Amino acid sequence: MEHVAIIDGQRHTVDAIQPVPGLRVYKHPHRDYGIGTYPVCLGHHEGRRIARTECTADAIDAARDLAEMADWTRSETEIQAAPGLAEKVADYLAGHNAIWAGGYR
């Protein structure tokens, strides 16, 4: 599926998959695969990135786990207003092979 990702304030159309409702996984348009590059993004369906991972499998696993924390089909505004969600997401990502991308904080 096509996904419009917002990266560094710019809109980019990328190919994506949706492993769970509301969350998309796609390759960052300006990062190549390689050790420590974290080129795969996990993002909200409205475009905001949540995390970067080293591979698609890690992003899919993160999406499945984050799906248990919130209804990601809601708007970004509703999700940002959820008490404690940003901290839960950041704590989860810190313990997994992912880099917090600054979304929902």
State where each predicted segment sits.
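Short intrinsically disordered terminal tails
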Residues: 1-3, 97-105
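Non-catalytic tandem-repeat scaffold regions and their flanking low-complexity/translocation tails
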Residues: 24, 60, 71-75, 79-82, ...
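Negatively charged, low-complexity tracts enriched in Asp/Glu with abundant Ser/Thr
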Residues: 1-20
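Charged, amphipathic alpha-helical segments
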Residues: 18-28
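A short, exposed loop/beta-hairpin motif centered on an aromatic-Gly-Thr core
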Residues: 45-58
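A short, sequence-level motif marking secondary-structure junctions
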Residues: 17-19, 55-60
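Short, isolated positions in well-ordered beta-strands
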Residues: 12-14, 25, 47-50
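Short aromatic-glycine-(Arg/Gly/Cys) micro-motifs in beta-strand/loop hairpins
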Residues: 32-48
